[in-house]
């Protein structure tokens, strides 16, 4: 039983699988921008989106028009049941296939798009990376993501995916097109935290794929 299958004339039921519900700014901004893009492309009448959240309290008020699904800590059966009721899955975390962040997170995304592919549904990774993986995770990705398409955010990730036999296209992180708040908003937040308005502020975001 392949579960829900899209038919002409009905909304596309799209499931977003990422790292949301922890107040990770990058993860939330990335997904907010994906949602804006999908709503723009499809129109609200043609798409019904759902998203996993680790903690619904931390995503309250986020992701307008999207149904939030509280994913449990032990998630294999939950993934199966949820993917089964959707037409397509988009994995949407930057650290998509790598062990340096959390293999459990990657396993959840592999499971989601792997289940979608097994049911002959759209299985997409959007704006992610593939990097160093432990042996178990690498084998999982190689086996279950072969029918997926990954829109990678750098060339290095494409090379890793090519070695695993997984189709990819070169793109970028969706957060690049997110419209931020005005600079004055950020300046006020810094002042509220003790900034004097003059001292240079250094922001570091190191990552090694």
Positions of predicted regions on the chain:
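Active-site anion-handling motifs in enzyme catalytic cores
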Residues: 1-209
């Amino acid at each position: 039983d392949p579960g829900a299958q899209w038919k002409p004339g009905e909304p596309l039921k799209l499931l977003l699988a990422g790292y949301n519900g922890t107040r990770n700014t990058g993860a939330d901004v990335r997904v907010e921008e994906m949602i804006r893009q999908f709503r723009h492309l499809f129109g609200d009448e043609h798409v019904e989106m759902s998203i996993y959240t680790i903690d619904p309290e931390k995503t309250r008020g986020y992701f307008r028009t999207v149904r939030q699904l509280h994913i449990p800590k032990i998630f294999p059966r939950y993934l199966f049941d949820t993917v089964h009721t959707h037409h397509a899955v988009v994995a949407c975390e930057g650290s998509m296939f790598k062990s340096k962040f959390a293999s459990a997170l990657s396993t959840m995304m592999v499971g989601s798009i792997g289940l979608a592919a097994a049911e002959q549904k759209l299985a997409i990774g959007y704006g992610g990376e593939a990097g160093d993986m432990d042996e178990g995770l690498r084998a999982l990705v190689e086996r279950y993501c072969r029918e997926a398409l990954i829109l990678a955010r750098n060339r290095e990730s494409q090379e890793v995916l090519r070695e695993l036999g997984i189709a990819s296209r070169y793109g970028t992180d969706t957060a690049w097109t997110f419209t931020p708040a005005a600079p004055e908003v950020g300046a006020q937040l810094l002042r509220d935290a003790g900034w004097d308005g003059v001292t240079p502020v250094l922001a570091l975001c190191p990552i090694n794929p």
